[in-house]
Amino acid sequence: MSLTLIVVLVVVLALFFDFTNGFHDTANAMATPIATGALKPRPAVALAAALNLVGAFLSTAVAQTISGGLIRGEGDHVSITPPLVLAGLVGAITWNLLTWLWGVPSSSSHALFGGLIGATIVGTWDAGSIDYHVLLGKIVIPALLSPVVAGLVAYSSTKLAYFATRRRDGRADGRSGFRYGQIFSSSLVALSHGTNDAQKTMGVITLLLISAGLQPAGEAGPQWWVILACALAIATGTYTGGWRIIRTLGKGLTEVKPAQGFAAETSTAATILASSHLGFALSTTQVASGSVIGSGLGRSDGHVKWGTAGRIALGWLLTLPVAAIVGGATASIARLGTAGLIIDLVIAVVVIVIVFRINARRRVTSAHMTPHAEAEVADATVALEFTRPGDEAAAVASPAGSAGAADREARP
C-alpha cells in the first residue's frame, strides 16, 4: 500500500474521530441549559456547532503539544509512523463510540492519547518513544486536577449565586433569570471546547504529516487546511447531538436549576480556556462533569447521584488504558504490512457499523431531552435496549452498570 494512500486513509479516520468527538462532547456545553429549559435541544446543538467551528480557529497550542511533544523524535523524524497513527485512531474511535452508546461521558481526549501511546509503544517496541514528562505535565496531572478545580469553582459560584439572590426564595419566578445567563455561559463552553478539542485532531494529522515526511518536525503547528477540516468535522459532529450523554449530564448526576447551571457552565469555560492557552490537553468532559457535581453540592437543597458519578469516574479511569490496549493490539496487526492495515481498517468499519446499528434499535433523540418528555432518569448511565420480533425487550448493560435499564422511554 502506497504511503500517499495510507496518509489519505488516516486523515479520513482522524476526521471521523473528530466528528465523534463533536457528538460525544456536545453535552459538555448544552446538557445543563437543555435540562433547565434555557435552550431547546435543536437550537442548543446548532449554537454549539457554530461556536465549536469558531473556537477551532482561535488557538493551536494544544495541537502543538500533541504533534511536537508527546511522541519523541530525533531531528526531522518522530518515532511514530502513519500505520501506527491509524492504529491509535482505531483504539480511540472504538472507546469513544462504545462510551457514547453506553451514555458514559468519558474523555475523547484521553481515548486519543491512549490509542496513540499504545500504538507507539507496541509498534516501535520502545517504551522510551513516549515523552513521559509531557504525558504527566500536560495530560495526566491536568486530568486529575481539572475536574476538582472546576468542581470547587462551581461549588463556590453556586453558593455565591444563591446567596446573592436569597431574597427571591419562594417566589414564582425564583431564579429563572439565570436561564438567560445560561445562554451566554453555555456558548462560552462551546467556544472553549472548540479551542481545545478540535486542536487534538489537528495535532494528530500534523503528527501524521511529520511522520510521513510531508512536514518538517520543527514546524509542529497545523497547516491551514488541517485547521479548516478539523473545525468543520467537529462542528458537524456537534450538530448531530450526543443525546445519550446530554441526558446523563443534564439529568443523571443532579437536578439542575438555572443558577446552578449558570455556575457550572462558567466554571467549565474558565477552566478550559485557561488550560488551552497553557497548552494543557485536558478533558473537557471531565471538567464539565466536575462542574455539574460541584454545582449540585453547592445547592443547599440539591444532591448528587453518587452511583452515577462513580460509574462516570470509572469510565475516566478506564479510558486511557483501554484505548491504549486497543491501539497496541491494532498496532501489532499493522506490523504485518499491507494485510495488517487492511485488517485494522476492517476492524474500524465493523466497530462503527455495529455501534450505529445497535443505536438505531433504541435511539435517544432530541425529543427525549425536554423536561416532560420522559420520566426522570433513575440512573442515566443508560443500558442499551433492543427488541427482537416476538421477544421481550432485552437489556444489554454497559460496563458502567446495569441500573440504567430502569429508563424505558418510548421509541420516537
Regions found by a protein language model. Name each.
Residues 1-412:
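Multi-pass alpha-helical transmembrane bundle typical of ion/small-solute transporters
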